[in-house]
Amino acid sequence: MKSDKVLDAKGLACPMPIVRTKKAMNELESGQILEVHATDKGAKNDLTAWSKSGGHDLLEQTDEGDILKFWIQKG
């Protein structure tokens, strides 16, 4: 999936993936897509809930070995 920006949050523990995601989203325009790479298993639930509560769309989420990838479209 095409993204406008990629955020490398691998190796970061909760809550840092969310903190970095929020900061990166603030730099995007509405409709743009942020691709997030994380290794913290808690990021799956955290990013799903954060996306919904923030009015963003979690377009896709995949597990590639130890790396979780998320594509979030800014609302």
Swiss-Prot record:
Family assignment from sequence similarity: Belongs to the sulfur carrier protein TusA family.
SUPFAM superfamilies, per the entry: SirA-like (SSF64307)
Name assigned to this protein: Putative sulfur carrier protein YrkI
Pfam families reported in the protein's UniProt record: TusA
Active site residues of this protein: 14 (cysteine persulfide intermediate)
Gene name as annotated: yrkI
PANTHER family on file: SULFUR CARRIER PROTEIN YEDF-RELATED
Residues passing through the membrane, by range: none
Organism listed in the record: Bacillus subtilis (strain 168)
Alphabetized InterPro entries for the sequence: TusA-like, TusA-like_sf
